[in-house]
């Protein structure tokens, strides 16, 4: 009887329920009943309105089987669901999806790894189905949380743990594919979801034993790697996620990366951080690269007080990002990048200076030394980043960056620099000067300007050649190297490397062009400034061999790039003045430096004589070099800059044949049409306002001795020494007149300098004002001479603006006593 009741009840059940029940066999090991499954599928396709009921009933059975741990029937139910999903059309599948997702959620909530993997696989199949019209009410918050948790599985069995993590990654990939394509349903990009998805992927990527070092887009991994290696699968999912990011949600995808790297302390060492940001930069669209750079800069600002190695790690990541972004769109962040980097460069120097001042003795010194080295790592990373970024900019932007960096360099006596150096002190200021010039050197590398005026405008050249940047030999080296980068427009510097006597300059195959009008104008305006810098740079006591090599290269590059006949004469005057300064030695230079200057002059005159190809000049230079080779090899660069070179005790006893003589050079050049009148006038460097303010020795005092005893130290054929009787009256007169002579010289120099550099309008206005003043003075004088003298016979009164005389009677007049009889 009970059997007949059950049969009767089953016959009264709805058809979709009977079809669903029939697909389950009595023994779950037999698997899905295929014939009944085909009937159920046909029914669902024929009556799509029944799909939601079919799904609800399947979900009910699956929930019951999950609770009762009947895994066999759970597998059959999910297999049936998958087949129904694949068979039904996309338009009719929507009512069925809610039941399907509910069943997947039940499986993911279960504690059995097998069921979790089963639910994930079903969800991935669902994610690959394209829907014509998405359902905006459908949310995937639960799946994001659950799949992210599976990515961090800590199961005791390694194989099961790997399987669960792979399932979690594949689930996240499915969520991404299902949601990110629809811009109207962008909830997946919200921070609360990205804060779960991105760290989960990075956690699995971090498990790679050897971090992938490829720098370009990766080759497609094999199917086996995708299925078995969580790290490879996570990396591909991460790339896919970033590739789908748009302008509005880029930052939400990148910021969790910083949080993960901070939390796990992955900036030092930073191999994984670099790897992550390479993936980011290659995966996102090129026009969004500057967003990532901005985020890195912002994070660097936020971590500015962290350990030096952490900051260095962030800066190296920035370098890698800039290296990739510079190839495409760099966005409007150029000045922001440099401004932030220079700010952190100043902070690093300040930290270094504070550590040096705070360290005292013992272990503190060791700790201070370690921090000092770490700060140098930070500084080198910043300079490398600045240089790489700057070298990839177009020329018009690079010139702006050059001016920007130069404006940051602290220069004595000016307040134009924009870096705060109040806390640095002298040592810190010198350090920041070196760091900024090194940055400038990196930016100017490879810069090619059509005219030298474009490369070295006055606003850039004046602070670059400031005496404040001559206090240290390393500063002078950097200044000269920056000038070489900007002057060398034909790549000749490599051919001039190393100071030496070149037997045949033609073998160097120097490239040069005709000097243009703009370059000629530049030398007329700024030539004396360049000569002065070279002249003073040669006379510094802390010069090393590299300084002399760079000074020689500077003279050679000016000759190649900027020299016409007038400039050649000026350069020869400069060389002779350097020779005279080494002989006179008014600065009390060591013998090595004096011989180094003599060697520098010899190398340059040998070069310039062959460049202008005047036979008599070449012959004189060659003769002096030949005599030096035999009698005074320490006057040649090949010997003086060699280790253990024998130095003379003095230079006063040397014969004139060892020196380059002005009259000989003038005679040889005059015969070839050169205007040599100025060769007889000794070179005198300009005196700047900064020289008066700075601590450097007065150039006027330096030059005065040179002019007076020049002829006595460099003997020539037509110079006769005269003796003068020295008396007390002569000495008294010389003392009284020396101050006035110096004042007159200074006045003349200022007048000449003003007429050379001041604009025409300014000179005309000043002359006009002087003419007006003179006219007023003349009018006053004429008025006094024409006006009659006051008479005792009357007095002058002024009424209503008119002068009137009032007469005095004779008896009231007052005469002098001598006039009265």
UniProtKB/Swiss-Prot annotation:
Keywords: Autism, Autism spectrum disorder, Cell membrane, Cytoplasm, Lipoprotein, Membrane, Palmitate, Phosphoprotein. Pfam families: EFR3_ARM. One of its GO terms (cellular component) is presynapse. The keyword Cytoplasm applies. Palmitoylated at its N-terminus, anchoring the protein to the plasma membrane. It is a lipid-anchor. One of its GO terms (biological process) is phosphatidylinositol phosphate biosynthetic process. It comes from the Eukaryota. Component of a phosphatidylinositol 4-kinase (PI4K) complex, composed of PI4KA, EFR3 (EFR3A or EFR3B), TTC7 (TTC7A or TTC7B) and HYCC (HYCC1 or HYCC2). Belongs to the EFR3 family. This is Protein EFR3 homolog A. The gene is EFR3A.
């Amino acid at each position: 009887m009970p059997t007949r009741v059950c049969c009767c009840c089953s016959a009264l059940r709805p058809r979709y329920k009977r079809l669903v029940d029939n697909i389950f066999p009595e023994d779950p090991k037999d698997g899905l009943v295929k014939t009944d499954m085909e009937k159920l599928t046909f029914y669902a396709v024929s009556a799509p309105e029944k799909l939601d009921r079919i799904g609800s009933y399947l979900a009910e059975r699956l929930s019951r089987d999950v609770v009762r741990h009947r895994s066999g029937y759970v597998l059959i139910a999910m297999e049936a669901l998958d087949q129904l999903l694949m068979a039904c059309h996309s338009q009719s599948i929507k009512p069925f999806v809610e039941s399907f997702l509910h069943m997947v959620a039940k499986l993911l909530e279960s504690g059995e790894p097998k069921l979790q993997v089963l639910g994930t696989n079903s969800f991935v199949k669902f994610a690959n189905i394209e829907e014509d019209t998405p359902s905006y009410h459908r949310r995937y918050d639960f799946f994001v949380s659950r799949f992210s948790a599976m990515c961090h599985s800590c199961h005791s069995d390694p194989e099961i743990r790997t399987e669960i993590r792979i399932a979690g990654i594949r689930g996240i990939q499915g969520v991404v594919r299902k949601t990110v394509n629809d811009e109207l349903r962008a909830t997946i990009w919200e921070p609360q979801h990205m804060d779960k998805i991105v760290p989960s992927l990075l956690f699995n990527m971090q498990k790679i034993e050897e971090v992938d070092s490829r720098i370009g887009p990766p080759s497609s991994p094999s199917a086996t790697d995708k299925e078995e290696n969580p790290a490879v699968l996570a990396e591909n999912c991460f790339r896919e996620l970033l590739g789908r990011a748009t302008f509005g949600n880029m930052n939400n995808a990148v910021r969790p990366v910083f949080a993960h790297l901070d939390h796990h302390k992955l900036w030092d060492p930073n191999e994984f951080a670099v790897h992550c940001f390479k993936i980011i930069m290659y995966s996102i669209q090129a026009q969004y690269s500057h967003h990532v750079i901005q985020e890195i800069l912002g994070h660097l600002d936020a971590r500015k007080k962290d350990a030096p190695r952490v900051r260095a790690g962030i800066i190296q990541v920035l370098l890698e990002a800039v290296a990739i972004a510079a190839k495409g769109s760099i966005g409007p962040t150029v000045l922001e990048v440099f401004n932030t980097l220079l700010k952190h460069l100043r902070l690093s120097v300040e930290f270094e200076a504070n550590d040096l001042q705070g360290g005292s003795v013992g272990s503190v010194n060791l700790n201070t030394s370690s921090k000092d080295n770490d700060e140098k790592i930070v500084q080198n990373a910043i300079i490398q980043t600045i240089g790489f970024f700057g070298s990839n900019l177009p020329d018009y932007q690079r010139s702006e960056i050059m001016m920007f960096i130069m404006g940051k360099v602290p220069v004595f006596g000016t307040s134009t620099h924009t870096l705060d150096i109040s806390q640095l002190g002298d040592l810190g200021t010198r350090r920041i000067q070196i760091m900024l010039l090194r940055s400038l050197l990196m930016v100017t590398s490879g810069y090619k300007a059509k005219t030298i005026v474009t490369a070295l405008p006055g606003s850039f050249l004046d602070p670059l050649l400031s005496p404040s940047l001559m206090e240290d030999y390393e500063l002078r080296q950097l200044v000269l190297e920056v000038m070489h980068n900007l002057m060398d427009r034909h790549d000749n510097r490599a051919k001039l490397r190393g100071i030496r006597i070149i037997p045949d300059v033609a073998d160097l195959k120097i490239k040069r062009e005709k000097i243009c009008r703009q370059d000629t104008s530049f030398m007329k305006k700024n030539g004396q400034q360049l000569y002065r810098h070279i002249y003073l740079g040669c006379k510094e006591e802390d010069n090393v061999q590299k300084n002399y090599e760079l000074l020689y290269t500077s003279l050679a590059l000016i000759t190649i790039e900027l020299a016409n006949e007038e400039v050649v004469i000026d350069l020869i005057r400069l060389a002779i003045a350097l020779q005279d300064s080494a002989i006179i030695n008014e600065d009390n230079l060591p013998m090595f430096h004096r011989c180094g200057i003599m060697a520098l002059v010899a190398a340059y005159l040998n070069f310039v004589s062959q460049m202008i190809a005047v036979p008599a000049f070449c012959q004189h230079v060659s003769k002096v070099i030949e005599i030096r080779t035999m009698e005074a090899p320490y006057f040649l660069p090949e010997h003086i800059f060699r280790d253990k070179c024998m130095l003379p005790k003095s230079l006063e006893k040397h014969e004139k044949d060892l020196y380059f003589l002005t009259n000989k050079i003038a005679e040889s050049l005059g015969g070839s049409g050169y205007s040599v009148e100025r060769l007889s006038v000794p070179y005198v460097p300009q005196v700047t306002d900064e020289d008066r303010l700075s601590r450097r020795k007065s150039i006027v005092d330096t030059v005065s001795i040179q002019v007076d005893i020049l002829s006595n130290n460099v003997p020539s054929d037509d110079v006769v020494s005269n003796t003068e009787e020295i008396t007390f009256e002569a000495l008294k007169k010389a003392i009284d007149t020396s101050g006035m002579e110096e004042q007159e010289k200074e006045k003349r120099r200022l007048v000449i300098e003003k007429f050379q550099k001041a604009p025409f309008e300014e000179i005309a206005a000043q002359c006009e004002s002087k003419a007006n003043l003179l006219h007023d003075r003349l009018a006053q004088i004429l008025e006094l001479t024409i006006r009659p003298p006051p008479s005792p016979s009357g007095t002058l009164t002024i009424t209503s603006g008119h002068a009137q005389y009032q007469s005095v009677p004779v008896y009231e007049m007052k005469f002098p006593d001598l006039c009265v009889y």
